[in-house]
Amino acid sequence: MTAPSMIREYEISAQSTAVFGRVLCSARNHHFIVDGPVQNGCPGEELTPPEVFLSAVGSCGVELVHVIAKDEKMPVESVNVRVRGIVDRGNQPRTDVTTFTRVELDFVLTGVDQKQATALVEGFKRR
């Protein structure tokens, strides 16, 4: 039996639309709209790129905590995470791109005790 690969590759496409600042994104056979923020003159009606990024981090956290709980046979009932991202343009770690200077995750788990919840979140951090 072959061991699973340590390398995973993902691909999406993004293309402009007839609406300024609105982008059509596709992943596999799924499509969704992303808007630039209002301060850039964009519609700002849909999720913005930073919100999509933070949503991806949050959904990864929820899904992986459930997977780890299942593997460890822990009775987690629900996993909620609040993700907050900060972009401090005056304190960027790099000069070639603008990045989040801080991303905070706050997990709330039910069905497990504090020790189990901590172990599950730590397991997510190591993934």
Per-region residue spans from a language model:
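Extended beta-strand/beta-hairpin segments
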Residues: 1-55, 66-127
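Alpha-helical metal-binding/catalytic segments enriched in His/Glu/Asp
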Residues: 60-61
